[in-house]
């Protein structure tokens, strides 16, 4: 189970390296959709069945619409792939070498530690017994998103609105 999560995380980062190397919008959209699907698999592997399904449906559904529109607007006769230009190829290779180096370093020195600790987990308990508590990940994760991360939800919604407005203005030609 740990190796599956580790492999999914490596594939996720390699997908982001492939996207950040700025290939043609066709290939960039494809890699971002694949990375989103792998990210949903990471969420499913960590026990968030409901959250993984919602992210898959909402995120990837929206991404397919946006990248379908982007691909139609930015169609190229000869799209730039990862091996077609020296700059793109070098950036992908540098990213992959850094990722492989990080994987080997983590495997050799066992340098993975927990970065985030929750201080008030007691308020998230669904059932508390004698010295133990039951936490269900799915409803607690959605509840924590809308309770403790309410400003993050507002900022995310505003960012999506501004992004749609910018795309509409660019498509209009102003």
Curated annotation (Swiss-Prot):
InterPro entries, sorted: ComplexI_Subunit6, NADH_UbQ/plastoQ_OxRdtase_su6
Catalyzed reaction equations: a ubiquinone + NADH + 5 H(+)(in) = a ubiquinol + NAD(+) + 4 H(+)(out)
Protein name: NADH-ubiquinone oxidoreductase chain 6
Chain's role: Core subunit of the mitochondrial membrane respiratory chain NADH dehydrogenase (Complex I) which catalyzes electron transfer from NADH through the respiratory chain, using ubiquinone as an electron acceptor. Essential for the catalytic activity and assembly of complex I.
An example Gene Ontology CC term for this record: mitochondrial inner membrane
Family: Belongs to the complex I subunit 6 family.
Signal peptide positions (record): none
Membrane topology term: Multi-pass membrane protein
Pfam families in alphabetical order: Oxidored_q3
Group of enzyme by EC: translocase
Gene that encodes it: MT-ND6
Subunit structure: Core subunit of respiratory chain NADH dehydrogenase (Complex I) which is composed of 45 different subunits.
GO molecular function per UniProt: NADH dehydrogenase (ubiquinone) activity
UniProt-listed GO biological process terms: mitochondrial electron transport, NADH to ubiquinone; mitochondrial respiratory chain complex I assembly
Transmembrane segments: 1-21, 24-44, 47-67, 86-106, 111-131, 151-171
Domain of life: Eukaryota
């Amino acid at each position: 189970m740990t190796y599956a999560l580790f492999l999914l995380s490596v594939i996720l980062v390699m997908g982001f390296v492939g996207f950040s190397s700025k290939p043609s919008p066709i290939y960039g959209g494809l890699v971002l959709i694949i990375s989103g699907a792998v990210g949903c698999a990471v969420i499913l592997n960590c026990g968030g069945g409901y959250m993984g399904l919602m992210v898959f449906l909402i995120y990837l559904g929206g991404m397919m619409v946006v990248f379908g529109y982007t691909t139609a607007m930015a169609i190229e006769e000869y799209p730039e792939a990862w091996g077609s230009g020296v700059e793109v190829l070098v950036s992908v290779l540098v990213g992959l070498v850094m990722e492989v180096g990080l994987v080997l370093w983590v495997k050799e020195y066992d340098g993975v530690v927990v970065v985030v600790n929750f201080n008030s987990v007691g308020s998230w308990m669904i059932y508390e017994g004698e010295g133990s508590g039951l936490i269900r990940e799915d409803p607690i994760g959605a509840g924590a998103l809308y309770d403790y991360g309410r400003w993050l939800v507002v900022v995310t919604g505003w960012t999506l609105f501004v992004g749609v407005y910018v795309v509409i203005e660019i498509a209009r030609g102003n």
